[in-house]
Design a protein with these regions (language model features):
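Short, well-ordered alpha-helical microsegments
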Residues: 1-3, 49-50
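Surface-exposed charge patches
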Residues: 4, 54, 183
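Hydrophobic/aromatic ligand-binding patch that stacks against planar heteroaromatic rings
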Residues: 4-6, 79, 155
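Structured binding elements
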Residues: 10
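Short beta->alpha connector loops at strand-helix junctions that form conserved
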Residues: 15-19
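Active-site phosphate-binding strand-loop segment of PLP-dependent enzymes
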Residues: 21-99, 104-114
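Active-site region of PLP-dependent enzymes
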Residues: 70-76, 83-190
Length: 190
Protein backbone atom coordinates (compact mmCIF):
# COMPACT_ATOMS: atom_id res chain seq x y z
CA UNK A 1 0.00 0.00 0.00
CA UNK A 2 2.87 2.39 0.72
CA UNK A 3 4.31 1.87 -2.75
CA UNK A 4 0.84 2.34 -4.28
CA UNK A 5 0.44 5.73 -2.60
CA UNK A 6 3.74 6.92 -4.04
CA UNK A 7 2.92 5.65 -7.53
CA UNK A 8 -0.60 7.16 -7.43
CA UNK A 9 1.00 10.50 -6.53
CA UNK A 10 3.19 10.26 -9.64
CA UNK A 11 6.36 9.22 -7.83
CA UNK A 12 8.68 6.27 -8.09
CA UNK A 13 9.02 3.91 -5.13
CA UNK A 14 12.59 3.07 -4.23
CA UNK A 15 12.82 0.16 -1.83
CA UNK A 16 15.49 -0.46 0.77
CA UNK A 17 16.31 -3.34 3.08
CA UNK A 18 15.25 -3.66 6.71
CA UNK A 19 17.11 -4.47 9.89
CA UNK A 20 16.98 -8.22 10.54
CA UNK A 21 16.16 -7.73 14.24
CA UNK A 22 13.41 -5.10 14.02
CA UNK A 23 12.11 -5.66 10.48
CA UNK A 24 12.19 -1.86 10.16
CA UNK A 25 14.15 0.36 7.82
CA UNK A 26 17.06 2.25 9.36
CA UNK A 27 19.02 5.33 8.37
CA UNK A 28 21.80 2.96 7.28
CA UNK A 29 19.51 0.99 4.94
CA UNK A 30 17.94 4.19 3.59
CA UNK A 31 21.15 6.18 3.03
CA UNK A 32 22.36 4.41 -0.16
CA UNK A 33 19.06 5.25 -1.84
CA UNK A 34 18.97 9.00 -1.13
CA UNK A 35 19.63 11.02 -4.27
CA UNK A 36 18.86 14.39 -5.82
CA UNK A 37 15.59 12.83 -7.00
CA UNK A 38 14.45 11.92 -3.48
CA UNK A 39 11.31 13.87 -2.54
CA UNK A 40 10.32 12.10 0.67
CA UNK A 41 11.09 9.08 2.82
CA UNK A 42 8.33 6.69 3.85
CA UNK A 43 8.90 4.46 6.86
CA UNK A 44 6.71 1.68 8.23
CA UNK A 45 6.68 1.14 11.99
CA UNK A 46 6.38 -2.63 11.77
CA UNK A 47 4.67 -4.85 14.35
CA UNK A 48 4.49 -2.10 16.95
CA UNK A 49 8.24 -1.48 16.82
CA UNK A 50 9.11 2.16 16.09
CA UNK A 51 11.66 3.09 13.45
CA UNK A 52 14.50 5.11 15.00
CA UNK A 53 13.32 8.44 13.62
CA UNK A 54 16.08 10.94 14.53
CA UNK A 55 18.64 9.47 12.09
CA UNK A 56 15.96 9.27 9.37
CA UNK A 57 14.92 12.89 9.94
CA UNK A 58 18.56 13.95 9.64
CA UNK A 59 18.39 13.37 5.87
CA UNK A 60 16.39 16.60 5.66
CA UNK A 61 13.59 15.08 3.59
CA UNK A 62 9.89 15.08 4.45
CA UNK A 63 9.18 11.82 6.29
CA UNK A 64 5.89 9.95 5.95
CA UNK A 65 5.25 7.48 8.76
CA UNK A 66 2.99 4.48 8.17
CA UNK A 67 1.94 3.86 11.77
CA UNK A 68 -0.98 1.48 11.17
CA UNK A 69 0.79 -1.31 13.06
CA UNK A 70 2.05 1.02 15.78
CA UNK A 71 -1.04 3.00 16.77
CA UNK A 72 -0.13 3.02 20.45
CA UNK A 73 3.65 2.74 20.16
CA UNK A 74 5.97 5.51 21.27
CA UNK A 75 9.51 6.55 20.54
CA UNK A 76 10.52 8.38 23.69
CA UNK A 77 7.46 10.45 24.58
CA UNK A 78 6.15 10.78 21.00
CA UNK A 79 3.63 8.48 19.38
CA UNK A 80 4.51 6.83 16.10
CA UNK A 81 2.88 8.85 13.35
CA UNK A 82 3.50 12.17 15.11
CA UNK A 83 7.24 12.50 14.56
CA UNK A 84 7.65 12.93 10.81
CA UNK A 85 5.94 15.31 8.41
CA UNK A 86 2.84 13.14 8.02
CA UNK A 87 1.55 10.09 9.87
CA UNK A 88 -0.77 7.70 8.05
CA UNK A 89 -2.90 4.91 9.47
CA UNK A 90 -4.71 2.19 7.58
CA UNK A 91 -7.86 0.87 9.22
CA UNK A 92 -7.89 -2.26 7.08
CA UNK A 93 -9.25 -5.48 8.67
CA UNK A 94 -5.75 -6.79 9.48
CA UNK A 95 -4.51 -3.62 11.22
CA UNK A 96 -4.41 -2.81 14.94
CA UNK A 97 -7.59 -0.77 14.64
CA UNK A 98 -10.09 -1.57 11.90
CA UNK A 99 -13.11 0.14 10.48
CA UNK A 100 -13.37 -2.37 7.64
CA UNK A 101 -11.63 0.03 5.27
CA UNK A 102 -10.28 3.54 5.37
CA UNK A 103 -7.55 5.32 7.24
CA UNK A 104 -6.39 8.46 8.94
CA UNK A 105 -3.77 11.17 8.66
CA UNK A 106 -1.91 13.28 11.20
CA UNK A 107 0.30 16.29 10.55
CA UNK A 108 1.36 19.53 12.17
CA UNK A 109 1.60 21.20 8.75
CA UNK A 110 -1.59 23.24 8.21
CA UNK A 111 -1.11 23.41 4.43
CA UNK A 112 -0.79 19.63 4.16
CA UNK A 113 -3.85 19.15 6.37
CA UNK A 114 -5.88 21.57 4.23
CA UNK A 115 -4.80 19.66 1.12
CA UNK A 116 -5.70 16.31 2.73
CA UNK A 117 -9.14 17.63 3.66
CA UNK A 118 -9.67 18.84 0.11
CA UNK A 119 -8.71 15.51 -1.39
CA UNK A 120 -10.72 13.35 1.01
CA UNK A 121 -13.96 14.95 -0.14
CA UNK A 122 -13.90 14.92 -3.94
CA UNK A 123 -11.41 17.79 -4.20
CA UNK A 124 -13.75 20.36 -2.63
CA UNK A 125 -11.95 23.55 -1.60
CA UNK A 126 -11.52 24.44 2.07
CA UNK A 127 -14.67 26.59 2.26
CA UNK A 128 -16.67 23.48 1.42
CA UNK A 129 -15.80 21.75 4.67
CA UNK A 130 -15.49 24.61 7.15
CA UNK A 131 -18.44 24.82 9.55
CA UNK A 132 -18.50 28.63 9.47
CA UNK A 133 -18.88 28.61 5.70
CA UNK A 134 -21.74 26.12 5.91
CA UNK A 135 -24.09 28.47 7.78
CA UNK A 136 -24.81 30.68 4.80
CA UNK A 137 -24.63 29.89 1.10
CA UNK A 138 -23.53 26.33 1.91
CA UNK A 139 -23.99 25.32 -1.71
CA UNK A 140 -21.14 27.57 -2.88
CA UNK A 141 -17.76 25.86 -2.94
CA UNK A 142 -14.90 25.32 -5.35
CA UNK A 143 -13.68 22.02 -6.70
CA UNK A 144 -9.90 22.44 -6.59
CA UNK A 145 -8.97 18.94 -7.75
CA UNK A 146 -10.52 15.75 -9.06
CA UNK A 147 -10.37 13.02 -6.45
CA UNK A 148 -12.65 10.23 -5.17
CA UNK A 149 -14.63 10.61 -1.96
CA UNK A 150 -12.57 9.14 0.87
CA UNK A 151 -14.58 10.16 3.93
CA UNK A 152 -15.46 7.46 6.44
CA UNK A 153 -19.10 6.97 7.23
CA UNK A 154 -20.33 7.54 10.79
CA UNK A 155 -20.68 3.82 11.53
CA UNK A 156 -17.10 3.05 10.49
CA UNK A 157 -15.80 6.04 12.47
CA UNK A 158 -17.73 4.89 15.55
CA UNK A 159 -16.23 1.41 15.28
CA UNK A 160 -12.74 2.90 15.02
CA UNK A 161 -13.23 5.18 18.02
CA UNK A 162 -14.58 2.29 20.12
CA UNK A 163 -11.51 0.22 19.23
CA UNK A 164 -9.18 3.11 20.03
CA UNK A 165 -10.62 3.21 23.55
CA UNK A 166 -9.74 -0.51 23.89
CA UNK A 167 -6.23 -0.26 22.42
CA UNK A 168 -4.51 -1.19 25.70
CA UNK A 169 -6.54 -4.40 25.94
CA UNK A 170 -5.80 -5.23 22.29
CA UNK A 171 -2.08 -4.64 22.82
CA UNK A 172 -2.03 -6.90 25.90
CA UNK A 173 -3.62 -9.72 23.87
CA UNK A 174 -1.16 -9.18 21.00
CA UNK A 175 1.79 -9.34 23.41
CA UNK A 176 0.52 -12.64 24.85
CA UNK A 177 0.21 -14.09 21.34
CA UNK A 178 3.68 -12.76 20.45
CA UNK A 179 5.16 -14.46 23.53
CA UNK A 180 3.55 -17.76 22.54
CA UNK A 181 5.09 -17.51 19.05
CA UNK A 182 8.48 -16.63 20.54
CA UNK A 183 8.40 -19.62 22.90
CA UNK A 184 7.20 -22.10 20.27
CA UNK A 185 9.69 -20.98 17.61
CA UNK A 186 12.71 -20.40 19.88
CA UNK A 187 14.38 -23.71 18.99
CA UNK A 188 14.36 -23.09 15.24
CA UNK A 189 17.56 -21.84 13.63
CA UNK A 190 16.40 -19.24 11.16
Amino acid sequence: ACAHAIILAGGISVFCDVDVNTQNVTADTIAPHISSKTRAIMVVHYAGKPVRMEPVLSFGQPVIEDAAQAVDSKLGNKYCGSIGTIGVYSFDPVKNITTGEGGGITTRDSELMTRARQLRYCGIGSAGFEAAAMKERWWEYDIVDVFPKLLPNDIAASIGLAQLRKIDKFQTIRKKIWNIYQAQLADFDW
